[in-house]
Design a protein with these regions (language model features):
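Catalytic cores of eukaryotic secretory-pathway lumenal/extracellular enzymes that build
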Residues: 79, 123, 128-131, 139-147, ...
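Cap/lid segment of the alpha/beta-hydrolase catalytic domain
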Residues: 37-111, 159-161, 165-166, 304-317
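Active-site-adjacent alpha-helix of alpha/beta-hydrolase-fold enzymes
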Residues: 269-291
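N-terminal cap/lid segment of alpha/beta-hydrolase-fold proteins
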Residues: 3-41
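C-terminal, loop-rich substrate-recognition/catalytic regions characterized by aromatic stacking residues
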Residues: 196-215, 303, 308-404
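Accessory cap/linker subdomain of secreted extracellular hydrolases
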Residues: 64, 72, 136-252
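Short beta-strand/loop motif that positions the catalytic acidic residue
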Residues: 253, 259-261
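Alpha/beta-hydrolase fold nucleophile elbow
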Residues: 113-126
Length: 404
């Protein structure tokens, strides 16, 4: 199949403004880095809202191109620290402010000098969540979003898995990222040092019980990570979680979406549900038709780019598996934000998927692929399947009682 051709630096020169303030509806000021192209006319905005620090948009050579690269293609690129993180003011609480702050930031960015009023968003993982949560508020100037590796719900597939708390993901992730960076933002060196040390030995904390008194996240101090303990206090899918569910709000999303997922990504199921949910329930006919998902042989971290490094998981597959993401994003934004003709957008729902083993790309119009046959598989063993070298089996045939 044909991807858009690999694209070098664009024609526009770029300047960067650091820590540009944006005032939210409650008066909190969030800070963004703004990459300005030297264009002679107003240009669209590409926005990223991140909890990992604005500089993180520049340091993933196996993932996205840099903000300056996108800006060189004559876009005004805005990378903002979300509330309570990095240079931004306010108090961080996982997901709680991302819908309203996302709406306010989209409208602020649309009114920036040099903007033509059209805004697209991009980003992966939590930075995909900041897009969806903004989109369900339907800001008038949001035209499209491009989320990657992000689930459809922040209870199922993120914090819990079929009712089981995702300890091995949640604890180290919070210690090493959102709780740590929020402590830096608050200027609390004691908590920063404690979290840094705990994250360095994250595996040793996986055996700690009970979760509700987990020492590294300081249950006695609500400034550290109150969302961790609130999540434990809400082990079922109740109103706490429904506030920021994506799957429950597809009918409020009015924009086309370019989705990216990987076969080895922890959030694959949710990403695919976002695609099928938008095709079925998007707020408008144009939104339902304007869905495209690309599912590659990638994990959550490295997609690989032909002009940088291969994703580690792809080293035995070769360049056929390298990511077309940046060129697809650029073509997608060119179509929806600049009105340019495109063969990759506007033709109805599309699924591009990499067939593992055969190492080929395919395109279809629906998921599951039309004609898919489902097969039930059964776990079995002779009683010694409790190690990686055990005698466990996976068979399409049901085993008789006793393992025979």
């Amino acid at each position: 199949m044909g991807w858009p051709p690999s694209t070098g630096t664009g024609p526009c020169q770029v300047t960067k403004q650091a820590d540009v303030p944006a005032r939210m509806r409650d008066g909190t000021v969030l800070k963004a880095d703004v990459y300005r192209p030297t264009a002679h006319e107003a240009v669209p905005v590409i926005l990223m809202r991140t909890q990992y620090g604005k500089a993180s948009a520049d340091v993933q050579p196996s993932r996205y191109q840099t903000p300056a690269w996108f800006a060189s293609h004559c876009y005004l690129v805005v990378v903002q620290d979300i509330r309570g993180q990095g240079a931004s003011g306010g108090t961080f609480y996982e997901y709680a402010n991302d819908a309203d702050d996302g709406y306010d930031t989209v409208e602020w960015a649309a009114a920036l000098p040099g903007s033509n009023g059209k805004v697209g968003m991009y980003g992966t993982s939590y930075v995909g969540a900041t897009q969806w949560l903004a989109a369900i508020r339907t800001p008038p100037h949001l035209v499209t979003i491009v989320p990657a590796n992000t689930p459809s719900d922040y209870y199922q597939n993120w914090t819990y898995e079929d009712g089981a708390f995702r300890l091995a993901f949640i604890e180290p992730w919070m210690m090493d990222t959102i709780a740590l960076s929020a402590a830096r933002q608050r200027g609390n060196p004691k908590i920063v040092a404690e979290l840094t040390e705990a994250a360095r030995n994250a595996a040793s904390w996986e055996h700690y019980r009970p979760y509700a008194t987990f020492p590294p996240l300081h249950p006695e101090d609500p400034s550290v990570a109150p969302y961790f303990f609130d999540a434990i206090r809400h082990p079922t899918y109740d109103e706490y979680w429904k506030r920021w569910s994506i799957r429950g709000h597809y009918d409020q999303v009015t924009v086309p979406v370019l989705h990216f997922e990987g076969w080895y990504d922890a959030f694959l199921a949710g990403g695919m549900e976002n695609f099928t949910g938008m095709v079925a329930h998007g707020a408008t006919a144009a939104a339902r038709a304007g869905q495209r998902i690309v599912i590659g042989p990638w994990d959550h971290i490295g997609w690989g780019r032909p002009d940088s490094i291969e994703a580690p998981i792809l080293k035995h597959i070769g360049s056929v598996a390298n990511s077309p993401i940046n060129e697809l994003m650029l073509a997608w934004f060119d179509h929806y934000l600049k009105g340019q003709p495109s063969t990759i957008a506007g033709s109805g729902p599309t699924v591009d998927y990499f067939e593992m083993g055969a190492n080929r790309w395919h395109s279809t119009t629906a998921w599951p692929v039309p004609g898919t046959r489902f097969t039930r598989y059964y776990l079995g063993s002779g009683g010694h399947a409790n190690t990686s070298t055990g005698d466990g089996t996976l068979s399409p045939q049901a085993l008789r009682a006793g393992g025979g």
